[in-house]
Amino acid sequence: MRATRSHDEREFTFDERDFRRVCRMIRDRAGIHLHPHKRDMVYSRLARRVRALGMEKFGDYLDHVETDPDAELQGFINALTTNLTSFFRESHHFDALAEHLRTRGRDGVRIWCNAASTGEEPYSLAITACEAFGTMTPPVRILATDIDTNVLHTAARGVYPVERVNTLSLQRRRQFFQRGSGANAGLCRVKPELQAMIEFRPLNLLSEDYGLRGGFDAVFCRNVMIYFDKATQYEVLQRVVPLIAPDGLFFAGHSESFGHAHDLITPCGRTTYRPASGVRA
């Protein structure tokens, strides 16, 4: 069994003061609240950045993030964000979306996926749109955003290990993916028609102005709010909900609930919401 280093044997000194400082910085810049039991995870992820920059102390690294944010703030955020995802995760949402899309007609449907991660969710949305409209070129545009620029790069490429795609039915794999061969054996790429439907863009949900046009027919904001406290959740919803069409849908994660924001969104299904009456951009 491979031995692991104890706290005293760590490559870099990382004390409680450093951890509290990291917690404050990631909360202020990304809204993420880190629990005390995440201390070892924080060390492991940020130690890679300290090492990559040739620094010797965590304090020096955190000083660098704060004094030169253009150089390292994004690297700091990327290291601490969690990107657990899969194709058609929480599949009932995609069934509900398909029904919703069929009611929208062919006038141009807009969907916002605001935790795109490595792309499985926005591509699942694109597949759902193709199936709902019965064509590889449905009248649907998808905006896929994430605070982590590294995962957005992976998402835009649309290339995945076969094991990641094998959770899909054989019909979906054949219709929506191209299997690699030779040097690309063991990989699959989403078909160009899916990529053409999606715009990938970095976005921080804590930003005061997202710079987005409203009227989204559906917004997927799943398993993001669990990292925010209730006050931050409400602030984010104040910005997001007015961007949804009055009869549009807001999809949340299975462990997220928003009773404290009943004036903004109203439940209409399993972790599915509509804008509350009177909410406008």
Please state what every model-predicted region is.
Residues 218, 259-281:
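Core SAM-dependent methyltransferase catalytic element
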Residues 98-102, 126-131, 241:
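A structural alpha-helix within SAM-dependent methyltransferase catalytic domains
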Residues 234-246:
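A short glycine-rich, Lys/Arg-flanked "PGG" loop and its adjoining helix->strand segment in the class I
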Residues 118-135:
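Conserved SAM-binding loop of SAM-dependent methyltransferases across substrates and taxa
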Residues 106, 160, 245:
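Short conserved AdoMet
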Residues 135-220, 224-235, 257-259:
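Extended basic-aromatic, gly/pro-enriched interface segments that bind polyanionic ligands
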Residues 1-112, 251-253:
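Conserved AdoMet
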Residues 107-119, 141-143:
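Conserved class I S-adenosyl-L-methionine
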